[in-house]
């Protein structure tokens, strides 16, 4: 969608020019995200399991909304390369990375930790092992 692409591009430009704008953007975006999260939960309440992928879950103090937290981690260099492969810029990666807690701190709030430094098949296998404990 061209409109979404242009919005993302504009937001990136704002963030790169003045990182302090992130706080303002978060105050606008986070209530909407939480509303969508709640709607998703309601629409899926009959399912045995529901999965969310939430950047900055712990940093945003959203842990209380979930029964199980799986922390998927990778070395900074690997995360940077993946970000660049998706068309991201190193400066943006560094700005976003600063917002994250350390792996040690995130691990304290996690029920499971999965290292994601290989390929998607290995990640899926590791996640399947965890999920099978709850089915």
Which residues are covered by each model-predicted region?
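Active-site-adjacent beta-strand anchor residues
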Residues: 26-27, 72-73, 116
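Amphipathic alpha-helical segments within well-ordered protein domains
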Residues: 12-13, 26, 80, 84, ...
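ATP-dependent small-molecule kinase phosphotransfer cores
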Residues: 1-46
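Small-molecule kinase domains that catalyze NTP-dependent phosphoryl transfer to phosphate-bearing small molecules
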Residues: 33-37, 64-65, 76, 86-135
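ATP-dependent NMP and nucleoside kinases share a basic, alpha-helical "lid"
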Residues: 36-43, 49-85
